[in-house]
């Protein structure tokens, strides 16, 4: 039965360019000279941990190497990653991380700015704001940018309606993140900013709450109500090397990076990359096992050249500004099922290790059991609050485009804490239910009523280690 469930679920100060010699060579007659781009800064965030989430840290390490090749200085790139992959006992190439089946090592040289327990929302916010006094642990590196500087932020992980995951609780909540961006803008700490987000329902982080006047442009891997996808996975085309049991990358993430690596970024615009990534992430506009790449904020920035944010690699001088040669169709797995795919691969490859195979089967069983518990509990809570006739329509209601997930974000956090207190931790899978909690708030249910429903729905359930006392609250 478990097997059936699994198969079904299945400084940059690059400015003042010291590179004027080759800049002048590649400058086209019709292109204006732009030697004054300010300092390029970047924040790269892998919001997960565990070998089954290999792909998120691989994405971030790959992004770091791309920026370094583009001339962005290490001192101006801040990296958040748990750093439990490269030397993980399951990694077939110790000390090496790859983001493509035939790709090079992307781990070497990546700075350990914020790792392990230091990968937190609080540190992320402090880094973006350039507030060293609020940073706890880590290298202490922050985005100490000026009004003429440009900032690039890339985030790769699991997500849910209104939230982005972190390896250490709580989640990143949309309104908190937007508030940080508003503060950064108010401080005059940058000229323009570009943000790329890889996560399920990542459009919900910005839908209805992202202002257009912050000089910030955003693209997300998915809209406000759909999954994003892992790729380069075992058993798929193209597959990772045979010894790998986990996905190497994420569809949106590898799409933008492989696009940047194969084009002249002094000639390719932000808009051209958006169009290319949108097509590839949709699986050639079929949206069959693909997602809708969205854009938010100040879309005037899309006319700018990508080198202003990613830098420029001299090796790409003769590359085209844009073409459609990247692989258009990829086999993928949705982010939430990638965990099961990883465990199933481990199970299948343990035929000659009966004890290990039994242990992995127990892990799969517990994972599926907790997922079923979360799904069933949320549905039962809806029935208790609204009755069997209205429950589903209320919990799963999607607001019109342009409206935020929830009107009261404090209420959302409160409802999440009530649920986790009585029903156990949401985990990276349970993020999918954030819309239901938001709709509970939007419908005016009191905290007391929610508490009664959670007690009734989850009374007697033993979540084992998956309680907030062990994992921390998601809000």
UniProtKB/Swiss-Prot annotation:
Signal peptide coordinates:
1-15
Q: What is its EC number?
A: 3.4.22.34
Q: What does this protein do?
A: Asparaginyl endopeptidase able to cleave almost all peptide bonds on the carboxyl side of Asn residues, except at the NH2 terminus or second position or with N-glycosylated Asn. Responsible for the maturation (circular permutation) of concanavalin A from its precursor, by performing both cleavage and cleavage-coupled transpeptidation to form conA.
* Subunit (UniProt): Homodimer.
The record lists the lineage as: Eukaryota, Viridiplantae, Streptophyta, Embryophyta, Tracheophyta
Identify its protein family: Belongs to the peptidase C13 family.
Give the protein name, as stated in the record.
Legumain
This protein's species is Canavalia ensiformis (Jack bean)
What GO terms describe the biological role, i.e. biological process, of this protein? proteolysis involved in protein catabolic process; vacuolar protein processing
According to the UniProt record, which cysteines are disulfide-bonded? 233-247, 411-441, 423-458
Identify the keywords attached in UniProt to this record, alphabetized: Disulfide bond, Glycoprotein, Hydrolase, Protease, Signal, Thiol protease, Zymogen
Query: Which InterPro entries does this entry report, sorted A to Z?
Result: AE (IPR043577), Legum_prodom (IPR048501), Legumain_prodom_sf (IPR046427), Peptidase_C13 (IPR001096)
């Amino acid at each position: 039965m478990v097997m059936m469930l699994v198969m079904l679920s299945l400084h940059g100060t690059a400015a003042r360019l010291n590179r004027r010699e080759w800049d002048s060579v590649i400058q086209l007659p019709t292109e204006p000279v732009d030697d004054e781009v300010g300092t390029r800064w970047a924040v790269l965030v892998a919001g997960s941990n565990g070998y089954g989430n290999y792909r998120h840290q691989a994405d971030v390490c790959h992004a770091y190497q791309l920026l370094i090749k583009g001339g962005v200085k290490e001192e101006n790139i801040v990296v958040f990653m748990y750093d439990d992959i490269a030397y993980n006992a399951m990694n077939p190439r110790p000390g090496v991380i790859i983001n493509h089946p035939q790709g090079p090592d992307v781990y070497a040289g990546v700075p350990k700015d914020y790792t392990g327990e230091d990968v937190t929302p609080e540190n992320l916010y402090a880094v973006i704001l350039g507030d060293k006094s609020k940073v706890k642990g880590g290298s202490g590196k922050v985005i100490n940018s000026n009004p003429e500087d440009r900032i690039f932020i890339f985030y790769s992980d699991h997500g849910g309606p209104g939230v982005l995951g972190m390896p250490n609780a709580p989640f990143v909540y949309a309104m908190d993140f937007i508030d940080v961006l508003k503060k950064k803008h108010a401080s005059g700490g940058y000229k323009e900013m570009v943000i790329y987000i890889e996560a399920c329902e990542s459009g919900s982080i910005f839908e209805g709450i992202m202002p257009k006047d912050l000089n910030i442009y955003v693209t997300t891997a998915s809209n406000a109500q759909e999954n994003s996808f892992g790729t380069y996975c075992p058993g798929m085309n193209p597959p990772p090397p045979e010894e790998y049991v986990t996905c190497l990358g994420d569809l949106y993430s590898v799409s933008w990076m492989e696009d940047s690596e194969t084009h002249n970024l002094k000639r390719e615009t932000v808009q051209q990359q958006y169009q290319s990534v949108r097509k590839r992430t949709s699986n050639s506009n079929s949206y069959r096992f693909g997602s809708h790449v969205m854009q938010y904020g100040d879309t005037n920035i899309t006319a700018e050249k990508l080198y202003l944010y990613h830098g420029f690699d001299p090796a790409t001088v003769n590359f085209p500004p844009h073409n459609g040669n990247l692989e258009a169709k990829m086999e993928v797995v949705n982010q939430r099922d990638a965990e099961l795919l990883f465990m199933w691969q481990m199970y299948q490859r343990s035929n000659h290790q009966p004890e290990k195979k039994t242990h992995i089967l127990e892990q799969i069983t517990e994972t599926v059991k907790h997922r079923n518990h979360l799904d069933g509990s949320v549905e039962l809570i809806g029935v208790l609050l609204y009755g069997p006739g209205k429950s589903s329509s209320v919990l799963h209601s999607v607001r019109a485009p342009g409206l935020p997930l929830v009107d009261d974000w404090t209420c959302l956090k409160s409802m999440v804490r009530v649920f986790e207190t009585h029903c156990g931790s949401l985990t990276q899978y349970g993020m999918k239910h954030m819309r239901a909690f938001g709709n509970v708030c939007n419908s005016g249910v009191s905290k007391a009523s929610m508490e009664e429903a959670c007690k009734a729905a989850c009374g007697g359930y033993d979540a084992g280690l998956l309680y907030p006392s062990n994992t921390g609250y998601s809000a």
